[in-house]
């Protein structure tokens, strides 16, 4: 049996480094995950006047971190912190199982 050498490990390292990129590329073209769809549905119910809702799992697919972008008339005349509190309240049960959440809110421009 041949002894281990750093040169022998190079192909393994190359493959390992490419895996996250490959996973990211596949994820970019995939439809929403079940968890993303669930969060989207909850937000649609809580913000019926929303003109745009986008939920993205930014944790690499494990469901620990999400980015939420939501545009709704319900946010009109509210400060950003109040808008984010509304989203947090709507997702209070789901947030318990998350590591983190990035929220971007806006009011539609007419």
Swiss-Prot record:
Belongs to the BolA/IbaG family. Acts as a mitochondrial iron-sulfur (Fe-S) cluster assembly factor that facilitates (Fe-S) cluster insertion into a subset of mitochondrial proteins. Probably acts together with NFU1. It comes from Bos taurus. It is found in: Mitochondrion. InterPro entries: BolA, BolA-like_sf, Mt_Fe-S_assembly_factor. It comes from the Eukaryota. One of its GO terms (cellular component) is mitochondrion. This is BolA-like protein 3. Its main location: mitochondrion. Keywords: Mitochondrion. It holds the Pfam family BolA. Interacts with NFU1.
């Amino acid at each position: 049996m041949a002894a281990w050498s750093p040169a022998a490990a190079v192909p393994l390292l190359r493959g390992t480094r490419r895996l996250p990129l490959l996973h990211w590329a596949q994820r970019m073209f995939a439809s929403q995950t079940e968890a993303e769809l669930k969060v989207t549905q909850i937000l649609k119910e809580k913000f019926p006047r929303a003109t745009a809702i986008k939920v993205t799992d930014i944790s690499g697919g494990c469901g620990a971190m999400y980015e939420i972008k939501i545009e709704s008339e319900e946010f009109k005349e509210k400060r950003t912190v109040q808008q984010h509190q509304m989203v947090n309240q709507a997702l209070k049960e789901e947030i318990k199982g998350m590591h983190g959440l990035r929220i971007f809110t806006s009011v539609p421009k007419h």
